[in-house]
């Protein structure tokens, strides 16, 4: 499987480095986004790469396809080997209220330990930053600001 996806292992530190390298200067000067970024940098999950799995890497509604009452995850261009909490963070951070994460994870078949919830939260925050940059780069300022507001409402900081 690693050969099929190019063997791309992505650690949280690598993800933050890539984010920082492509961060537009206007967003670099945003004190709120800087605060979230520094939180992420100071709280990088300590999860062994030996436990990494193949993850989709872009689990959002733009990549969902419903057909005959089945939900399909499409557009596997962002596939990588990473912490499985990456996809969960993207999904839960944007679509499930934090107060429902434990219940959702139990339904998913996962025991919501403090360690797992911390990792999922980290990736949820990271995904918000990624989406904010995406909206900025595509000139979607209204959507970018709405994403910042959702980040503040969901996680504070």
Model regions and ranges:
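An alpha-helical support segment within catalytic cores of ATP-dependent transferases
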Residues: 1-57, 147, 151
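A general structural signal for well-ordered alpha-helical segments in protein cores
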Residues: 16-19, 101, 129
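ATP/Mg2+ or Mg2+-diphosphate-binding catalytic cores
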Residues: 24, 133-157
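Residue-level recognition of alpha-helical structural elements
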Residues: 29, 116-118, 140-144
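Alpha-helical elements of Rossmann-like donor-binding domains used by nucleotide-donor carbohydrate transfer enzymes
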Residues: 35-39, 90, 103, 107, ...
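Conserved catalytic-loop position in the HRD/HxD motif
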Residues: 58, 63
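Active-site Asp-x-Gly
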Residues: 66-117
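Hydrophobic alpha-helical segments that form the core
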Residues: 121-130
């Amino acid at each position: 499987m690693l050969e099929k996806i190019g063997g791309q292992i992505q650690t949280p530190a690598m993800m933050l480095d890539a984010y920082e390298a492509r961060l537009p200067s206007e967003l670099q000067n945003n004190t709120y986004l800087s605060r979230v970024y520094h939180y992420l940098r100071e709280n990088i999950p300590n999860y062994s790469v030996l436990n990494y799995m193949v993850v989709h890497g872009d689990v959002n509604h733009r990549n969902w396809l419903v057909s005959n009452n089945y939900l399909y995850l499409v557009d596997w261009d962002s596939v990588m080997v990473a912490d499985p909490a990456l996809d969960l963070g993207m999904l839960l951070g944007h679509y499930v209220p934090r107060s429902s994460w434990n219940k959702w994870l139990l339904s998913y078949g996962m025991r919501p330990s403090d360690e797992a919830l911390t990792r999922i939260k980290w990736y949820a925050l990271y995904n918000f930053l990624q989406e904010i940059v995406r909206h900025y780069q595509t000139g979607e300022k209204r959507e970018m600001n709405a994403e910042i507001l959702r980040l503040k409402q969901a996680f504070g900081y």
